[in-house]
Structure formats: structure tokens, C-alpha cells
């Protein structure tokens, strides 16, 4: 069976390839301590990469708090966000429209890197939970190969606007948003 790189890598646009390569370099620079926590947090958020603070080295098992051993020790990926703590990746789906090939890749990535659940957002986007920071560039490349990006999927940017699919012709709408 062919690996994803053999099938999809030549389909990534030069612009997306460069953006992902730069982000991967920023991850390495952060790991080496050459990028400030706050700056890296802003950088990763623009790429749809969230740190999940609730899991910073501790997990409550229902009876007591358990300490989790993270191999990277005290390295942070943002203020108060441990490097190895599971994160979340938001995926931008303009117009909420997907092709079958894109759905296959989204499903495969959910099984391979997340908890097997592809979360649908109120803004017609998707989220993967329990993603390790180091896996994000590979996930981004696979998404880019089918025309999907995480760029500006979060933060103070314009995202999908959700409206009624029959706006303008719906007889009981309060106002026409079309």
C-alpha cells in the first residue's frame, strides 16, 4: 500500500508548502528555546494549533489527580501550556463544503493522530483533539494535499459565517442575510 506522501505530496501548492515548512521550523526553534512562549503561542494559534491547558501534566481519574510524565519535561508551547500536553487542531472548511477525497483524509487523520473523533464546529469547521504539537506539520501537509488548510482557523480572523441555506426565500425569516 502506498504511503500518503507518494499519493498526495505533489498536490500541495507551493504557498501552503512554504507556510507549513516555516511553521515546522518555528516548532524546532521553540524546542531549542530560541522563540518566546507568547510569540510562539500567537504563531501556532494563527495556524489553528491550540494548547489545551486542562491537561498540563495532570489528569483527574475520577478519584484523584494523577501526574502524567511528559518526555519533554518543562518545555512549554505557550504560556502555562506544556509541550507534550495534548492539543487541538482546528481545520478551516470554507463554505462548509467538502469533497469525498477530503472527507477520507479528514477521517484517516482522526484515526491516526486524534481520538478517532472529528469534531464539527458551529462555524462549519472541524477540530481534532489530543494532537501532539510535533504531529501538526505532517497533518497540515496531508490536509494541504487535498486543498484544506488550518491557516487562520482561529484567533481574531474572519471565519465561516453561518446562515440559513434558504435565506432570502424563507417565509418566516426575521431579515434577509443573503
What do these predicted regions represent?
Residues 1-89, 105:
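Iron-sulfur (Fe-S) cluster-binding modules
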Residues 62-63, 86-178:
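Small-residue-enriched alpha-helical segments and adjacent helix-cap loops
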Amino acid at each position: 500500500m502506498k504511503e500518503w506522501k507518494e499519493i498526495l505530496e505533489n498536490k500541495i501548492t507551493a504557498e501552503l508548502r512554504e507556510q507549513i515548512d516555516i511553521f515546522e521550523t518555528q516548532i524546532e526553534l521553540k524546542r531549542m528555546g530560541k522563540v518566546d512562549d507568547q510569540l510562539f503561542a500567537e504563531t501556532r494559534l494563527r495556524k489553528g494549533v491550540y494548547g489545551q491547558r486542562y491537561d498540563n501534566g495532570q489528569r483527574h481519574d475520577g478519584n484523584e489527580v494523577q501526574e502524567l510524565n511528559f518526555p519533554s519535561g518543562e518545555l512549554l508551547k505557550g504560556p502555562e501550556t506544556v509541550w507534550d500536553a495534548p492539543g487541538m487542531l482546528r481545520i478551516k472548511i470554507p463554505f462548509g463544503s467538502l469533497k469525498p477525497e477530503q472527507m477520507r483524509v479528514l477521517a484517516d487523520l482522526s484515526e491516526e493522530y486524534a481520538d478517532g473523533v472529528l469534531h464539527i464546529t458551529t462555524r462549519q469547521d472541524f477540530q481534532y483533539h489530543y494532537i501532539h504539537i510535533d504531529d501538526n506539520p505532517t497533518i497540515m501537509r496531508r490536509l494541504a494535499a487535498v486543498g484544506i488548510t488550518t491557516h487562520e482557523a482561529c484567533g481574531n480572523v474572519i471565519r465561516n459565517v453561518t446562515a440559513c441555506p434558504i435565506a432570502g426565500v424563507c417565509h418566516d425569516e426575521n431579515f434577509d442575510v443573503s
